[in-house]
């Protein structure tokens, strides 16, 4: 997590280009949004969502994409009241499964496996990635591929969508670890429902003749 305020000049060099063609479209959320930035992160006496809420903000973006109506403030409040943090403000990743009632399940805490990341993105499952920002632990949401090559990200600290390499360098060294999540598959239609629909359709055609 990004602890404390980091001067933007630490990581901002040349202007970054907006994420492009093959990225999953996920609206960006900023951990520094005034609607929640000042809220205490978990039960921490010092950290706030704005200073260290990158992980929950990245997860909140992913959950919104998967149809869960949430934001960093609501997610943080639930985690705080339901044992979703360790050591005051460290996200327990498996709590995501409980929070969503199993609609989105935490499926892995893994090393920087670029092949797995690509497979997840190809399956339209965004990936939470651990990086370093100004010497501090930070989390971003990998959303797809850029037309210029490499991964695209939604970055909670900056509240923008950019190419990973423009901000954090080569993914093979810039990604320290990943967290993966599996949305529940929508229920398949029951055979009876399908047969009933077909019967109704046939009857409608006959009536129209």
What are these regions (language model features)?
Residues 1-84, 133, 147, 189-191, ...:
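Active-site-adjacent structural segments surrounding the nucleophilic cysteine of cysteine proteases
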Residues 132-209:
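Active-site signature of cysteine proteases
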Residues 12-16, 89-96, 114-117, 163-168:
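Intrinsically disordered, low-complexity boundary segments flanking structured domains
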Residues 53, 57-61, 74, 91-95, ...:
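Extracytoplasmic/secreted proteins, especially bacterial periplasmic and envelope-associated proteins
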Residues 44, 108-152:
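Active-site-adjacent substructure of cysteine-protease-like catalytic cores
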Residues 69-115:
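Catalytic cysteine-centered active-site loop
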